[in-house]
């Protein structure tokens, strides 16, 4: 009943929730966990790993055959697991279709109708970053969402590239910058269909440009003329005379 109420408040009728388990042994109580999956699950990046359900009766968490499982990745998470708590259902601190909130004042103001209480800290979060989501096949990670734990680490390519900004599409948006033989994919941004998400998208592009000292020589975008990412790319190209 608590999960149903959370779904009602979040307006999330069917989308699966993630589960944070105390450790890999706890994860094995509800899912099949291979050696390769445990290695990724227990690694320092701590993504959400899609694991096959071990038994029925967990449809309130996920209606399909898999559950997204992650292990604690901050000291605070470990403190939440008392003697009588082995697993926690997790969901992002956001309103439907808007970016995750990471400032205390904004969360308290906007999430009071969803959350019954708030666990806050005076150490402010500097950059919004969702959990990474992957599955494991043949010992390798395949991403549905490459974000916390992996960003802003670059990917090496086999040639020298010009300074590029690739703006991505509209749904499940992200962007990418290039410099030398490296490309720097951004974290997951979300669907670009409201001002809040667009503001986060443009702010993260500026943050990456400062972080890696990249001033693009060209901008790459989707051909769809009505995508917000395409409109942004066109505006930047005109502004910078690219």
State where each predicted segment sits.
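Active-site-adjacent structural elements in enzyme catalytic cores
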Residues: 1-241
């Amino acid at each position: 009943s608590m999960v149903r109420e959370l779904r009602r408040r979040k307006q999330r009728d069917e989308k699966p929730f993630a589960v944070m388990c105390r450790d890999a042994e706890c994860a094995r109580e509800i899912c099949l966990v291979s050696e390769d999956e445990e290695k990724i699950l227990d690694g320092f990046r701590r993504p959400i790993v899609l694991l096959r359900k071990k038994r029925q009766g967990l449809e309130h968490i996920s209606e399909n055959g898999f559950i997204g499982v992650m292990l604690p990745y901050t000291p605070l998470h470990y403190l939440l697991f008392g003697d009588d708590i082995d697993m926690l259902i997790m969901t992002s601190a956001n309103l439907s279709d808007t970016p995750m909130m990471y400032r205390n004042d904004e969360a308290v103001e906007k999430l009071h109708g969803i959350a019954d209480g708030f666990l806050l800290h005076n150490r402010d979060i500097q950059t919004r970053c969702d959990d990474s989501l992957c599955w494991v096949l043949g010992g390798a990670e395949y991403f549905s969402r490459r974000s916390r734990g992996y960003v802003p680490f670059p990917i090496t390519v086999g040639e020298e590239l010009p300074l590029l900004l690739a703006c991505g599409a509209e749904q499940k948006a992200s962007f990418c910058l290039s410099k030398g033989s490296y490309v720097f994919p951004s974290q997951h941004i979300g669907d670009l269909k409201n001002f809040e998400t667009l503001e986060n998208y443009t702010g993260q592009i500026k943050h990456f440009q400062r972080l890696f000292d990249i001033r693009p020589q060209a901008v790459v975008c989707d051909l769809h003329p009505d995508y917000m990412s395409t409109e942004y790319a066109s505006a930047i190209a005109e502004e910078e005379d690219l």
